[in-house]
């Protein structure tokens, strides 16, 4: 976790306008949107770190915090994998290619990829929780030789909920071993059944003290993932989660996203587990 | 610069000087049976001869036996209504042929002189400065207003039953953060300048150096405020106390009394939570993004697509109190409470946070 | 044939004030008429286009067997049914009959009570049919009505705040009349929507937008009792336009029982 990349100057409420350059349907109710800045200077300046998010703004409808799913080295188009859930994402889903919207960002903390160098890395993703981890996968693949054993454990409610399946073969070939599992099986499913935590329990860990685990998914899944990892001997300081809260400003000024002493928008969304653990599973905090 | 003396009859000259410098004067005035902050034109608008009597859940305006200008403490308003307005436009968006044109609103042209800012309120402004100006991101709305304001502080010479600034080390003496600070005596004010702008204004007023007797009278007047404070919040170890007692039975106890009505957060001079909404015409071609005061006591405040995080009064009261007194320290290096007592007075059912903290210090049954 | 959504306005037991709010939306009415086909709105025009309708705005409570049948027909004819106003969402002021003997009222008011067919209660639409959205208030707020219509035209969920009235008093700078004057005020437990009008005009909120979510009415009532206000003053305050909502009813019933016990 590092300090925000964005400068302290300027008006944090101002949006850039971006145009939808491409829409790729993923799973039911989920699509990946590639955005291009209408202002080339803004495009040249824009950089993000894996785990960070943007505020996407549809005038008259509102803003939504959406994590980046793009390649960290992207320079022209930035993809966001978005599930239709609220008013903003519903309205976004009605826009086609060429549609224009507002964007502020990037905001928040990022996955500690540099701390993963020389280590084994496990990614545990539940459902659409894989979206903010995809930039990590891209980065690990791009610098494969710098890391040890790389594993992605991806769980979903049903086979139709597994994300980016068309890329899994490439990831496997590139050296990230992908394992998938589903809560509820289906007629054509021959794979694992159970939660991603079950996959983690079975995963051989040759050197737990030198393994980093990054997880994103429902709170309860991340909780049990962290518990399983601790039981397997991973230090709490090498577990990282990505939290979610109501966000309105994204810059620590509106108060909505607090989780104990943390502002999820600024201190998170990516937290080292030992920092957030005292507050993470307190009911209603 | 030595303490100076301003005759009461010359207070209007200070107001005229500030008006002449382009400041709009805002200060205490009687309205709706309370002392509120509003625009004032002259010393005649001040609540001269009035005082307030406060208790948990109760505020009464009463006449004084003397003609004091500042013989009361703090009311339902705070200066945040000028620095962090209850409603502000963040951005406008207009539909164009190719998409949207988005603009920041123009910066305000007015500048305010705050008249009668108390020590706890100076502390509150400092707390909000830390939030809005000194973090990674600066709030442009707050900054534009804060940069331009002139502060005339007033030392309290009495205390309400709800005051506890001495527990929070924020008062009652105004130490810093003002341009001018006044201490009211029977016929004059002792004036201290706290900034270059303050010293400049002093140079344009008919002031003379205060005599030792006058300085002693001011000291005695200020001491009355200290002596009048009866409420106490024990702050020793308060951060750990609250954050390690998140399941204390007292939270359910206070939740049975708390209305979750948000009054405490609205009157609090440091609470800074807000929500952003869209205001559009029916066609949706012109849009304004508006920020409004909001509160962690509202159900929707923590709503996500998956549901509401703090879905009962217990969790919301706990959020407010732990944030104000404990996690604020983690976030901003200081307490979010300045001991002004507004949340106690203006709670419709008389909940007193100092009593809640005291109860949290007791182990549950 | 128009492809604009078809809007119908229906009335049950009510004063017509909420429907009039639609006519009162003068600045927006032309835009509304442009965006919707107003197929049935007897308060404005005798033209009635038969159903089905895309949106029905329904005012009034259910007080007669005929009402109870007719609201089911309205539901059958309407894709999206919006209950507007305290009568439609809570039974209205006429729900005071729910605490009394309606036959007694009939005998007192009508020369031939046997001509009158009525139910013993006045109840909200949602007690009879599925309601898609409830717009509270007595009367409803014009701005909120326009928001509901704009949202339906845009195909999104209406944005109507559900916090308490106190937030709005504080935002507009109104001094709390409960704390500063000891006036019993329902603001802390009442849903906003009016813009906090009454306290700004020196009177307590009388709850016309109904209970706020998770309203702690019992604690507020206890505080008043401790402060010297008697149940005789509090029961009528709670039994008002939204008196028959469960939150207000439970506490007024408790206070009434206390009053009866002391008499």
Which positions does each model-derived feature cover?
Chain B
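Iron-sulfur-associated redox domains of electron-transfer enzymes in respiratory
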Residues: 1-243, 249-251, 271, 282
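Single, functionally critical "micro-switch" positions that shape active/binding sites
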Residues: 21, 261, 340
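Residue-level detector of anion-binding/catalytic polar loops
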Residues: 24, 264, 343
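A generic structural-conservation signal
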Residues: 27, 267-268, 346
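Ferredoxin-type iron-sulfur electron-transfer modules in oxidoreductases and energy-metabolism complexes
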Residues: 235-256, 274-365
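Extended amphipathic alpha-helical segments enriched in small hydrophobics
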Residues: 255-265
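A donor-sugar binding/catalytic signature common to diverse glycosyltransferases
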Residues: 263-279
């Amino acid at each position: 976790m590092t300090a925000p990349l964005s400068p302290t100057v300027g008006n944090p409420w101002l949006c850039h306008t971006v145009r939808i350059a491409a829409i790729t349907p993923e799973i039911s109710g989920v699509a990946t949107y590639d955005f291009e800045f209408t202002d080339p200077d803004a495009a040249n300046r824009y950089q993000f770190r894996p785990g960070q998010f943007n505020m996407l703004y549809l005038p008259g409808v509102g803003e939504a915090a959406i994590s980046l799913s793009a390649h960290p080295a992207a320079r022209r188009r930035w993809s966001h994998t978005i599930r239709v859930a609220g008013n903003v994402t519903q309205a976004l889903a009605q826009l086609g290619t060429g549609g224009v919207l507002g964007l502020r960002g990037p905001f928040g903390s990022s996955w500690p990829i540099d701390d993963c160098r020389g280590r084994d890395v496990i990614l545990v993703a539940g459902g659409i929780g894989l979206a903010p981890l995809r930039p990590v996968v891209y980065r690990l693949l791009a610098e494969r030789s710098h890391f040890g054993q790389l594993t992605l454990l991806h769980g979903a409610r049903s086979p139709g909920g597994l994300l980016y399946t068309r890329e899994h073969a490439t990831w496997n070939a590139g050296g990230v071993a992908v394992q998938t599992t589903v809560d509820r099986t289906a007629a054509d499913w021959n794979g694992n059944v159970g939660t991603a935590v079950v996959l983690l329990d079975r995963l051989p860990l040759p050197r737990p003290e030198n393994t980093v685990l990054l997880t994103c998914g429902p709170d309860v899944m991340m909780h049990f993932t962290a518990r399983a990892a601790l039981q397997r001997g991973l230090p709490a300081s090498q577990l990282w989660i990505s939290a979610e809260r109501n966000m309105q400003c994204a810059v620590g000024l509106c108060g909505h996203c607090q989780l104990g002493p943390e502002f999820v928008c600024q201190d998170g969304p990516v937290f080292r587990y030992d920092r957030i653990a005292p507050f993470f599973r307190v009911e209603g905090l | 610069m030595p303490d100076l003396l301003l005759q009461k009859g010359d207070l209007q000259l200070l107001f005229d000087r500030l008006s002449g410098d382009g400041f709009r004067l805002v200060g205490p005035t009687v309205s709706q049976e309370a002392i509120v902050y509003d625009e004032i034109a002259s010393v005649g608008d001040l609540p001269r001869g009035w005082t307030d009597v406060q208790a948990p859940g109760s505020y009464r305006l009463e006449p004084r036996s003397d003609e004091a200008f500042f013989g009361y403490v703090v009311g339902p308003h705070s200066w945040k209504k000028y620095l962090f307005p209850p409603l502000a436009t963040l951005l406008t968006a207009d539909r164009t042929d190719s998409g949207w044109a988005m603009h920041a609103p123009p910066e305000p042209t007015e500048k305010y002189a705050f008249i009668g800012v108390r020590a706890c309120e100076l502390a509150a402004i400092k707390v909000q400065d830390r939030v809005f100006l000194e973090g990674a991101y600066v709030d442009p709305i707050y900054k534009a207003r804060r940069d331009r304001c002139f502060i005339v502080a007033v030392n309290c010479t009495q205390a309400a039953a709800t005051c506890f600034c001495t527990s929070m080390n924020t008062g009652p003496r105004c130490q810093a953060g003002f341009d001018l600070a006044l201490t009211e005596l029977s016929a004059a004010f002792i004036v201290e300048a706290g900034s270059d702008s303050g010293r400049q204004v002093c140079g344009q007023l008919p002031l003379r150096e205060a005599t030792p007797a006058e300085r002693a009278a001011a000291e005695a007047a200020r001491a009355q405020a200290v002596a009048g404070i009866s409420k106490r919040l024990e702050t020793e170890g308060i951060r750990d106390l609250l954050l390690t007692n998140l399941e204390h039975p007292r939270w359910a106890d206070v939740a049975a009394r708390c209305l979750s009505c948000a009054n405490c957060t609205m009157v609090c001079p440091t609470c800074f939570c807000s929500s952003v909404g869209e205001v559009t015409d029916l066609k949706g071609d012109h849009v304004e993004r508006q920020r409004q005061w909001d509160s962690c006591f509202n159900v929707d405040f923590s709503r996500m697509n998956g549901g509401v995080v703090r879905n009962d009064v217990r969790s919301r009261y706990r959020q407010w109190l732990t944030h104000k007194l404990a996690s604020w320290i983690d976030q901003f290096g200081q307490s979010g409470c300045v001991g002004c007592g507004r949340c106690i007075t203006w709670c419709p059912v008389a909940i007193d946070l100092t009593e809640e903290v005291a109860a949290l210090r007791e182990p549950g049954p | 044939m128009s492809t604009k959504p078809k809007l119908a306005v229906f009335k049950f037991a009510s004063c017509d004030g909420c429907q009039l709010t639609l006519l009162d939306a003068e600045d927006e009415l032309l835009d509304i008429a442009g965006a919707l086909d107003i197929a049935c709105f007897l308060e404005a025009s005798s033209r009635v286009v038969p159903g089905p309708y895309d949106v029905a705005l329904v005012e009034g409570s259910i007080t007669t067997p005929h009402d109870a049948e007719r609201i089911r027909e309205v539901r059958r004819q309407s894709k999206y049914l919006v209950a507007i106003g305290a009568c439609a969402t809570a039974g209205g002021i006429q729900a005071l009959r729910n605490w009394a003997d309606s036959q007694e009222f009939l005998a007192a008011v009508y020369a031939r009570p046997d001509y009158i067919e009525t139910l013993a209660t006045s109840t909200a639409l949602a007690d009879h049919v599925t309601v898609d959205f409830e717009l509270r208030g007595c009367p409803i707020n014009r701005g909120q009505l326009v928001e509901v219509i704009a949202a339906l035209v845009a195909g999104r969920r209406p944005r109507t705040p559900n916090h308490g009235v106190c937030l709005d008093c504080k935002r507009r700078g109104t001094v709390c009349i409960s704390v500063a004057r000891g006036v019993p005020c329902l603001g802390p437990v009442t849903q906003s929507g009016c813009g906090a009008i009454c306290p700004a005009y020196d009177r307590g909120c009388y709850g016309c937008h109904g209970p706020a979510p998770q309203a702690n009415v019992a604690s507020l009532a206890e505080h008043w009792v401790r402060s010297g206000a008697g149940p005789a003053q509090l029961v009528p305050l709670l039994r008002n336009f939204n008196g028959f909502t469960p939150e207000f009813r439970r506490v007024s019933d408790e206070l009434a029982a206390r009053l009866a016990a002391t008499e």
